[in-house]
């Protein structure tokens, strides 16, 4: 996601 963390940094990486 946007600022969701480690797993989501493949998509956004904040």
Curated annotation (Swiss-Prot):
The keyword DNA-binding does not apply. It comes from the Eukaryota. Keywords: Amidation, Neuropeptide. Pfam families: Tetradecapep (PF08187). One of its GO terms (molecular function) is neuropeptide hormone activity. To insects allatotropin. This is Myoactive tetradecapeptide. The lineage of its organism: Eukaryota, Metazoa, Spiralia, Lophotrochozoa, Annelida.
């Amino acid at each position: 996601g946007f600022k969701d963390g480690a797993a989501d940094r493949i998509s956004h990486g904040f």
